[in-house]
């Protein structure tokens, strides 16, 4: 089955607003962290709850991330040949074993368990690949605003496939913005050239942005309510990152999105999430 017949049509990256309005959502920040963390320090957990993000954390060596980069290079060639673009590779863990292996990777899962607890669902995998001079930006937004899920207890692990810095349009966070809950947004204007479709206007009134500079193989972790975005990549270098999404097992997904979820730690006692096997 071709990529375009599966992932690009099964789940929309951006749902219609009407579909989201049908879901009653609890979009408040819930303090995260376990009493006895095994990988993160208590200070890191406190910083996450205060700022809404952690960065940078080294997870993979240069040789290890080079293997993942070669896989992505091949995947990108396949997707573009099928008519997709560098932002359209989403929910790939349900089709590609290599992405599933990253979603369930012990080093990554250990990080999120220290924030979310023992019972964890991995439900998202989306490559955000900014090609050189592609002109597209990601406007200021909150992830939870896009998702038919409740309550808002998802964290995103952003894995740098390439180096990400100011020159090639790394992500930016507004510290503490997650404490304001679900913020008012507007549909993006065409001249924004937004990869997505929501914009929180005048976002910097909530604080001064912080650049998420990462070397390939490093990750950052952010809350689903943390304001973030990125500018257009005007450099000669590509900037690719893989977003991996995790939530507590008590989160409920609607519009069929529970089909995305894989139990990466503990159990899903209610059996809400599909827990698809590793693709081969």
How would you name each of these model-derived features?
Residues 149-151, 203-204, 234-238:
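A generic structural micro-feature
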Residues 2-121, 215:
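N-terminal auxiliary "cap/dimerization" subdomain that precedes the catalytic jelly-roll/cupin core
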Residues 37, 53, 156-160, 209-211, ...:
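Conserved hydrophobic/aromatic beta-strand scaffold that supports enzyme active sites
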Residues 63, 131, 165, 180, ...:
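Feature marks short, surface-exposed loop/turn motifs that line or immediately flank catalytic pockets
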């Amino acid at each position: 089955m071709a990529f375009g017949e599966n992932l690009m049509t099964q789940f929309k990256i951006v749902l219609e607003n009407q579909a989201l309005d049908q879901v009653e959502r609890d979009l408040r920040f819930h303090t995260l962290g376990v009493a006895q963390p095994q990988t993160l320090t208590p200070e890191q957990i406190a910083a996450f709850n205060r700022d809404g993000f952690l960065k940078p954390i080294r997870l993979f060596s240069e040789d290890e991330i080079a293997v993942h980069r070669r896989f992505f290079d091949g995947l990108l060639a396949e997707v573009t040949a099928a008519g997709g673009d560098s932002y359209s590779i989403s929910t790939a863990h349900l089709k590609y074993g290599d992405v599933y292996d990253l979603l369930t990777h012990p080093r990554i899962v250990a990080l999120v368990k220290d924030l979310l607890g023992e019972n964890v669902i991995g439900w998202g995998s989306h490559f955000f690949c900014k090609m050189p001079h592609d002109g597209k930006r990601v406007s200021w937004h909150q992830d939870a605003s896009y998702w038919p899920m409740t309550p808002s207890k998802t964290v995103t692990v952003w894995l740098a496939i390439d180096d990400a810095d100011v020159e090639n349009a790394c992500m930016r966070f507004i510290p503490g913005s997650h404490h304001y809950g679900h913020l008012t947004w507007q549909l993006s204007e065409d001249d924004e050239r937004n990869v997505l479709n929501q914009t929180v206007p005048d976002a910097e009134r909530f604080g001064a942005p912080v650049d998420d500079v990462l070397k390939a193989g490093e990750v950052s972790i952010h809350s689903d309510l943390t304001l973030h975005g990125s500018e257009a990549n005007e450099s000669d270098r590509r900037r690719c990152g893989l977003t991996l999404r995790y939530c507590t097992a008590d989160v409920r997904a609607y519009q069929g999105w529970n089909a995305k979820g894989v139990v990466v730690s503990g159990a899903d006692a209610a059996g809400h999430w599909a827990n698809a096997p590793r693709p081969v």
